[in-house]
């Protein structure tokens, strides 16, 4: 996703019909708040730059990344799209793999069931340093990328 955005800035022009009336949900994992807050700030910045009103950005906080799909599902009747933001850092057990698989499957299932764009802004890294590099560091901010993705999908959906 990010390499596409960096290489193709002309593709970032997103033409939304009546963007000031579109409500977008952002579900944020409370685990690793030093990462997820920066992801949220990046996503919110992109939405505001694309004329989504601040009062139409609905934030829902959940305990961890595993709860992101349920948080997204709760928002689907109130919004036109959802951005899921979280951070899972690999440890010494298989827990990482189970969480990453469950979250990615859950998010796509919510999207397909609700027929709404739901973006996957969950960092899955080996270290905290890698997560920091992807939440405003040298590898950009994946919260921004997730917001661009959901806006682009909204534009495609409304053609």
Regions found by a protein language model. Give the residues of each.
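Glycine-rich phosphate/diphosphate-binding loop of Rossmann-like nucleotide-binding domains
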Residues: 12-59
